[in-house]
Curated annotation (Swiss-Prot):
It comes from Angiopteris evecta (Mule's foot fern). GO terms for molecular function: structural constituent of ribosome. It comes from the Eukaryota. It is found in: Plastid, Chloroplast. Pfam families: Ribosomal_L36. Transmembrane segments: none annotated. Its main location: plastid. Keywords: Chloroplast, Plastid, Ribonucleoprotein, Ribosomal protein. This is Large ribosomal subunit protein bL36c. Belongs to the bacterial ribosomal protein bL36 family. The gene is rpl36. GO terms for biological process: translation.
């Protein structure tokens, strides 16, 4: 999980979701997991 100021989709499989007022990226590739800090 990478915590970043700006999150964006890295590949086509990345999905942008909102969880507890946080924007997160979930993907089939575990390296692409991100969360907005």
């Amino acid at each position: 999980m990478k915590i970043r100021a700006s999150v964006r989709k890295i590949c086509e499989k990345c999905r942008l979701i909102r969880r507890r007022r946080r924007i997160m990226i979930i993907c089939l590739n575990p390296k692409h997991k991100q969360r907005q800090g």
